[in-house]
Amino acid sequence: MKTTIKSTILAILSLVFIVCLVSCNTAEKTGVWENATYLNDAEFGNGAKTVVVEVKAEEETVTFTIKTDKDTVGAALIEHGLIEGEEGQYGLYVKVVNGIRADYDLDKRYWAFYVDGEYAMKGIELTEIDEGAKYRLEYAKE
């Protein structure tokens, strides 16, 4: 009888611990992050090159570490469904990053692309991967 009670109490405490652990590790989707695919840092792929891309929107940031065999930052992100866009006269116009849409026509928002803290001089699909570089996509407003 005592063993059954101890086992039941242990099972209940274990369940409570698991629920607390899961709920503490879950970020809440709010604002522009409501449609985000990832709310926490994530790793993708298993290629020879490593590219690290920070995604910043409002006050929140996630970092994606991608191992890829692709040659450009854009191709690595597209390979894992992390960006979407439309081809335009100047190359790929990124409209969605991590599930977050920036619609310039609607609210003058766009995705700015930075390399080592400087606004990129080339589009994301033309920027070759430099494993030592710091890349950032930032939800910006004109």
What do these predicted ranges mean?
Residues K2-L13, V19-E142:
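Ubiquitin-like/PB1-type beta-grasp interaction modules and other compact soluble beta-rich domains
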